[in-house]
Amino acid sequence: MNISRLPLLVCAVLVYWLVAAVAPPVTPTASPAAPQSDMAETDTAKNKSASQSAPKTSKKPKRAAGLLYGIAKAPAKAAGTIRLGAYNIENLFDGVDDPSLSGEYDDIKMQTSEDRCKSLAKAIHDLDADVLCLEEVEGEDALRWFRDTYLKDMGYEFLASKEVGYYRGVEQSLLSRFPIKDVQIWTTEDLAPMEKYIPKDTDQRKKEGWGDDPKVKEPLKFQRSPLKATIDLPSGQELTIYVVHHKAGGKATAHHRELESLRMNEMVKADLAKNPDAFVAVVGDLNATPMEKAAKLYRDKDFAGLVSAYEFRPEAGQAKEKKSAAPDATDSSAQADGSADANADESDAKSDATSKADAKSKAAEKLAAKNLYLTHITNRSIDYILLSPALVKIAVPKSFFVFGTLMPGSDYDYKKDQPPAGYASDHCPIAIDLKSAATNSAKPKTDAATPPAAKEVAK
């Protein structure tokens, strides 16, 4: 370094320090990029706010709203038959306050919208059941109001619904074109004695398909008591119906459902012991798929020995189509000289594409066939009509069906979102036809709609 230049360097540093000390401070910009416009900043804030509070709508739902299950048009009833139907109508509430319900389960908040009422009514009209078993109805007043307002031309002169003390304020009900009598419920039934049917050994329980044994044993009763009633059929015979709605939930509540099912099986078995030729049906929402224990028990010959109406679907009993061996498109014997033929390569490619398309088509057909008999928005079959041996004899072959109603898209959140227009329930109705010596084909009209009476605290 040239020492002679050192004084100049020191002076330069001193001058720079003095200028920096006197000059006003410079506020740094938020970003090295050009400043954003007011509109851009507003859009950013809106996007941030939307991402924090609004539901995600940017992605297209994997499944759009539509008819996902069942058939689009209910078949007409054959002459001389009676149609037995079931429908969980997902919390049918009228507009009259029930003082016993408040807070989260205030019935006024739960009032069923006009659109849903009309959609439910349309499904019930199309189903055209002579005897219709319903689940999740607020009560007799609400059912009567709904019938008189939306089903005046259906001929449902008779109805039944009884308060079961369920905390959400819903119960099982009946609408019928034929007289109803001997209505019963079991609101205090102790299910503990049903434990005698369940193995104590954990491994044995699993082997037999029972639910896990609860660590804490609480006194259990029917979550929603079944409703039992007798229908006087036009033929002069009687039809005994149990309208059921088992405890909801997954594996954690399987044990409760099984106890409910066991007690129901005892009741049905007792009925059939008195009269093996009795017309007895268990109808409703079991909250269990066909291979779960709570549902299988009904079909067990050691218990009630009932037959599921699913056995009377059009496809039931048909021989399975044998798999035919597809020709191998790459077989070298197709070429006499074994040469690489361009036309053969093109043919192979087309054959491969056709095979893939056929496989995809068959998979779609298989899925569509399965969807014909799913009944719940969760892609499950959990709604049933279970028949006694005498009813099996008069069940019309291939007459069982699931009637398709509009289901929301896969992005629907029932806790937050309003259901789409035309939505009726998270369940689809089901039905089967029964032969009868004489049927009441006429549909007498009910009286004009009357406003539901004010509810009392104790129903």
Where would I find each of the regions flagged by the language model?
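A long, amphipathic alpha-helix that forms part
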Residues: A254-P276
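A well-ordered secondary-structure block
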Residues: L174-P234
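Active-site environment of divalent metal-dependent phosphoester hydrolases
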Residues: G139-D141, Y167-G169, G249-G250, N287-K293, ...
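Metal-dependent phosphoester-hydrolase catalytic domains
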Residues: Q36-K48, A54-A74, V268-A281, A288-K459
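Active-site metal-binding loops of divalent metal-dependent hydrolases
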Residues: I89-L92, V137, H246, G284-L286, ...
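Bacterial N-terminal signal peptides
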Residues: L9-A20
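N-terminal, active-site-proximal structural segment of metallo-dependent hydrolase catalytic domains
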Residues: N2-P7, P28-T149, D153, A160-E171, ...
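Beta-strand-turn-beta hairpins that frame and shape the catalytic cleft
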Residues: A76-L84, F93, P214-K217, K221-H246
